[in-house]
Amino acid sequence: AMICALLIGPILGGIGTMVVTKKMAFFSEAVGHAAMTGIAVGVLLGEPFSAPYISLFTYCILFGLIINYTKNRTKMSSDTLIGVFLSISIALGGSLLIYVSAKVNSHALESILFGSILTVNDTDIYILVVSAIIIGFVLVPYLNRMLLASFNPNLAIVRGVNVKLIEYIFIIIVTVIT
């Protein structure tokens, strides 16, 4: 538990500040709930029900990227889009979990859906270490540009920062962390 806290704590602190600044708290909550659908899809596709991480990460990253893409193409508010996509994802995930529960014990999925830092296993720690390393390598070259784009997007554009690219990178980082 201490290893997990030491790995993820500094990343959450730094990224959390930008999440609040960009008013994306609802987005991170939506990604967390969309994970249910990723888990159900993974179990349906044959991943082990104790660790359907590939489908979980894939679904959540696609979920975040689609929301961001749609936000950039419409004039709807972010919260409206997030609410719509969240509702669709939860409905799909709930339906798939009902179908999946006939094949596996639904209580076995609870440890993934409602995890606790006190009940992490070796696989969770390996996934966390790999995620932290990847996020660290992505953050180092982009951190200053992310901070500038978070606090003052207009200044970032004037300074030549590709704000859209930074936004997509930030979405992926928040999605993986969540």
Predicted regions and their residues:
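Membrane-embedded alpha-helical core segments of multi-pass
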Residues: I11-L12, V19, L62-I66, S89-G93, ...
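Transmembrane helix-bundle core of multi-pass membrane transporters
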Residues: I82, L86-V140
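Alpha-helical transmembrane segments of integral membrane proteins
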Residues: I3-C4, A51, S55, Y59, ...
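Helix-loop-helix "hairpin" substructures at the membrane interface of multi-pass membrane proteins
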Residues: N121-T178
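Short juxtamembrane and helix-loop transition motifs at transmembrane-helix boundaries
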Residues: G13-K22, A40-A51, L147-V158, I172-T178
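Short loop segments and helix-boundary regions at transmembrane helix junctions
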Residues: T17-K103
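Short amphipathic alpha-helical coupling elements at transmembrane boundaries
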Residues: N68, N72, S111-L118, N154-V158
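Membrane-interfacial amphipathic/re-entrant helices at transmembrane-helix boundaries
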Residues: A1-P10
